[in-house]
Amino acid sequence: MTANDPSPNHLQLTRDGQLRHFLTLDGLGQPLLTDILDTADSFIEVGERSIKKVPLLRGRTVVNLFFESSTRTRSTFELAAKRLSADVLNLDISTSATSKGESLSDTLLNLEAMASDMFVVRHSQSGAPHFIAESVTPGVAIINAGDGRHAHPTQAMLDMLTIRQHKGRFEGLKVAIVGDVLHSRVARSQIRALNVLGAEEVRVIAPGTLLPRDVEDLGCTVEYDMARGMKDLDVVIMLRLQKERMEGALLPSEREFYRLYGLNQEKLGLAKPDCIVMHPGPINRGVEIESAVADGPQSVILNQVTNGIAIRMAVMSMAMGGQMAERQQRQQEGRA
């Protein structure tokens, strides 16, 4: 199973439309995305309590299965699970049996034998979380924490939550995504979410070497010139150069990229005065964005990090709720 196979919604949704896995935003409608945002909103205040816990996943075991490293994403998933009162296991892939030749399927079988309830999966191979969702026994939820170039649905949703907090709506908004779109799973999920939630225009601004061939099919307009692309923007999302995924010379130099596509105060001044600046992190200062902008009054980058915990709490609690509802359905059907 790969990311190019038919809609995964037979996997990620129950028969009555609840989440049971969270693999991709493809095929999910506005009501469900709005429900995720609303649920996350309700969890924001948990982080402001003296005791930052709710009992929704008490007695459940969540396994963070990260085949790619990511300090920020893994940390926020771990915090989200713990704030839901789950037990959390962080699997170190570099020392696990998988690194010693054990197959992914065997690793999963062993983890399931330990009565795990949820796997949070980050993998360099597109479609890996989908494959895992097909392989696990019923009742185990899979959350995609980023797979190859395919998708990063929780990052996109925390970005949508941040936009809604600061703009109050999606209708009428003009949003640009700037930088290395070619290698970005985040950009693909962001474009999908923005279109479903009703943004007026989604632009991508990048050199042709950093754009996928089918970029316009994703639901966006393309601009190669930063000055033109910044005009009338409500939101600008900067992406880092993913040099670890680049094959060959796609750029003359980082300095040249920054000159043409890096966000500084002068370029930000071409957007609307209340344009907000976002970045999924990690930030390469002086490559895609200057410090004065990243740390400036229009930056909401740290809000994104805070919202990551709330969004992941929402998705994890909703997916586990869907699994539990489906389990009850199976039990009732078995007694019928």
From Swiss-Prot:
It comes from the Bacteria. Its EC number is 2.1.3.2. Keywords: Pyrimidine biosynthesis, Transferase. Carbamoyl phosphate binds at R72, T73, R122, H152, Q155, G281, P282. GO terms for molecular function: amino acid binding; aspartate carbamoyltransferase activity. Pathway: Pyrimidine metabolism; UMP biosynthesis via de novo pathway; (S)-dihydroorotate from bicarbonate: step 2/3. L-aspartate binds at K100, R185, R240. It catalyses: carbamoyl phosphate + L-aspartate = N-carbamoyl-L-aspartate + phosphate + H(+). One of its GO terms (cellular component) is cytosol. InterPro entries: Asp/Orn_carbamoyltranf_P-bd, Asp/Orn_carbamoylTrfase, Asp/Orn_carbamoylTrfase_sf, Asp_carbamoyltransf, Asp_carbamoyltransf_Asp/Orn-bd. NCBIfam families: asp_carb_tr, PRK00856.1. Heterododecamer (2C3:3R2) of six catalytic PyrB chains organized as two trimers (C3), and six regulatory PyrI chains organized as three dimers (R2). PANTHER family: ASPARTATE CARBAMOYLTRANSFERASE, ORNITHINE CARBAMOYLTRANSFERASE, MITOCHONDRIAL. This is Aspartate carbamoyltransferase catalytic subunit. It comes from Marinobacter nauticus (strain ATCC 700491 / DSM 11845 / VT8). The lineage of its organism: Bacteria, Pseudomonadati, Pseudomonadota, Gammaproteobacteria, Pseudomonadales. The gene is pyrB.
